[in-house]
C-alpha cells in the first residue's frame, strides 16, 4: 500500500462501527487566555510567590537589543530556580535605554557598549558635518556695502 495513503488513513478518526464513513479529527484552536490559564496552573504547582515593588525589568540580548517590561508582574520560586515575568514587553535598542540602564549592565555588556560608543560619535559627526557641495556661497545674509552712510548723515545735518 502507498505510504502517503496509509499516513492519511492513520490521521483520520473513525467514528462508529464497521461501514460508517470516516471523518476528520476536530482541530482544537487554543486561545491566549487558555494558554495563560495553563501557565498559571503550572506556576501554582511550583509554589511561586509574587514579588511586589518591581517597576521595570530589562533583558539584554546578545545583539544589542533590550526586552523592556514596564510595571511587570514578577513571580519567583527559589526552590525550582524559576522566575516568571508577565506583562507588556517592548523590544528596544540599547542606545534608547541609556543612561538609565548603565547600572544594570554586566561586564560583557559594558564591552559591547564601549564598541557602540566608539561608533556613535562617528555617526553623529558624519551626519552633522556639511559636505562641500552642500555649502552655497551665494546665500550670504549680509549685503554688500555700496555707499558710505557717514557722508549722507553729515550732509543732512548741514
From Swiss-Prot:
The modification N6-methyllysine is found at residue 5. PANTHER family: TRANSCRIPTION FACTOR BTF3 FAMILY MEMBER (PTHR10351). Keywords: Methylation, Phosphoprotein. InterPro entries: BTF3, NAC_A/B_dom_sf, Nas_poly-pep-assoc_cplx_dom. It comes from the Eukaryota. Belongs to the NAC-beta family. This is Transcription factor BTF3 homolog 4. Residues 123-158 are annotated as: Disordered. The gene is BTF3L4. Residues 33-98 form the NAC-A/B domain. The keyword Repeat does not apply. Residues 134-150 have a biased composition (Acidic residues). It holds the Pfam family NAC. The modification Phosphothreonine is found at residue 111.
Amino acid at each position: 500500500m502507498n505510504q502517503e495513503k496509509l499516513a492519511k488513513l492513520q490521521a483520520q478518526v473513525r467514528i462508529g462501527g464497521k461501514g460508517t464513513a470516516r471523518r476528520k479529527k476536530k482541530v482544537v484552536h487554543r486561545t491566549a487566555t487558555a494558554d495563560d490559564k495553563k501557565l498559571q496552573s503550572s506556576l501554582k504547582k511550583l509554589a511561586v510567590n509574587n514579588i511586589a515593588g518591581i517597576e521595570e525589568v530589562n533583558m539584554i540580548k546578545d545583539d544589542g537589543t533590550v526586552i523592556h517590561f514596564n510595571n511587570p508582574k514578577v513571580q519567583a520560586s527559589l526552590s525550582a530556580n524559576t522566575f516568571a515575568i508577565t506583562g507588556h514587553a517592548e523590544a528596544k535598542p540599547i542606545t534608547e535605554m541609556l543612561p538609565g540602564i548603565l547600572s544594570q549592565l554586566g561586564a560583557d555588556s559594558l564591552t559591547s557598549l564601549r564598541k557602540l560608543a566608539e561608533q556613535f560619535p562617528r555617526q553623529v559627526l558624519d551626519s552633522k558635518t556639511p559636505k562641500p557641495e552642500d555649502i552655497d556661497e551665494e546665500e550670504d545674509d549680509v549685503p554688500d556695502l555700496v555707499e558710505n552712510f557717514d557722508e549722507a548723515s553729515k550732509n543732512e545735518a548741514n
